[in-house]
Amino acid sequence: MKFIQLSLIASLIMVAPAVNAAQLISAKEAALPSASGTLATRGISRGPSVKLVSPEADTSVSSPIDFKVHFEARGEGKIDPNSVKVVYMKSPFVDLTPRLKGAISPQGIDFAKADVPPGSHTIRVTVKDADGRETNSVFTLNVTK
């Protein structure tokens, strides 16, 4: 009887789903040279508000990270989730949008357990509302080992 119980427990452990991190940025992409030029966002915009929720700005975190961005339309506008574009600011630019498609909604981006190599990673998020008003926001993720 003891053997059957141990066998059952062992088989459950073996088939239990593993919690794996999904790759947001590869080590090869992180090794690319940084994009040249000034990375700035406009101060005044009628476009949607874009705010980094997680990880907190100016905070070092270890991978995997929960990458969360909040969108908020201004006035009566509605966010167009199909307009969202996420770019890793390297030379050449790396479009991260396809990796995040399932995590993008009108409320924002919610990508749990994102695998990101150590280093400083600059990401630009572009979003438009239904009226075509656009906002570009640039965030830097600081990831430690």
Residue positions per predicted region:
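Solvent-exposed loop/turn segments flanking beta-strands in beta-repeat/beta-sandwich domains
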Residues: R74-V86
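Short beta-strand edge segments in extracellular beta-sheet folds
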Residues: T140-K145
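Surface-exposed, short loops/turns at beta-strand junctions within beta-sandwich domains
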Residues: K113-S120
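Extracellular and select intracellular beta-sandwich modules with Ser/Thr-enriched
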Residues: E134-F139
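Short, compositionally biased P/S/T/A/G/V-rich stretches that sit at domain boundaries
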Residues: A21-I65, E72
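N-terminal signal peptide c-region/cleavage motif recognized by signal peptidases
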Residues: V15-A18
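Conserved structural position at the C-terminal beta-strand
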Residues: V125-V127
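Aromatic sugar-binding surface patches on proteins
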Residues: K101-D110
